Regions:
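Membrane-spanning alpha-helical segments of multipass transporters and channels
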Residues: 1-164
Length: 164
């Protein structure tokens, strides 16, 4: 997994036309991808433990997880236009949201727009300041730990013998 992430980010960096020495976003992007991948692996483990090997049910659950991530991930529907329950509660568990927002902040934030200008991309996503990047990293780490602990708890519950 790590080798694939390193290769993916290196290829993207090579074809971006901006060398890493000036952009300085290679290793932070690797960190974002590793945290996002580890968190999504935890979600997959929880889903596979819950459906107990039923492939059709796992496919339906996977599609539901995908659509929920697409809705709450600030991809197609802007979060600031949604109801506060979706925006403030459910979107905190969207791994895609925090991965996207952190990578967008690396690309367009941190003073890249000079002279008091505001990036149109960050404005449309309602990202106000650069400190949101660290919030995204913290939430990715929290989601990773939460999903891994949930998978471990479910696995422990499933394999533990029932005492009657």
């Amino acid at each position: 997994m790590i080798v694939l992430i390193l290769a993916y980010v290196a290829i993207g960096d090579f074809f971006s036309g901006q060398p890493t020495s000036t952009a300085n976003i290679y290793w932070p992007l690797v960190l974002i991808f590793v945290l996002s991948t580890a968190a999504m692996q935890g979600v997959g483990q929880v889903a596979s433990i819950l459906v107990s090997g039923n492939t059709v049910t796992l496919l339906v659950v996977s599609m539901g997880i995908f659509y929920l991530n697409a809705l709450l991930g600030n991809f197609f529907v802007r979060l600031h236009t949604l109801h506060y329950v979706y925006r403030d509660v459910l979107s905190q568990f969207s791994i895609g949201r925090f991965g996207l927002e952190a990578s967008i902040l690396l690309q367009y934030g941190f003073g890249r727009c000079t002279g008091g200008k505001v990036s149109a991309v960050l404005y449309s996503m309602a990202i106000d300041d650069d400190a949101h990047y660290y919030h995204c990293l913290l939430m990715l780490l929290a989601n990773c730990l939460l999903t891994r602990l949930a998978a471990l708890a479910l696995l422990t519950y499933k394999v533990r013998p029932v005492k009657r």
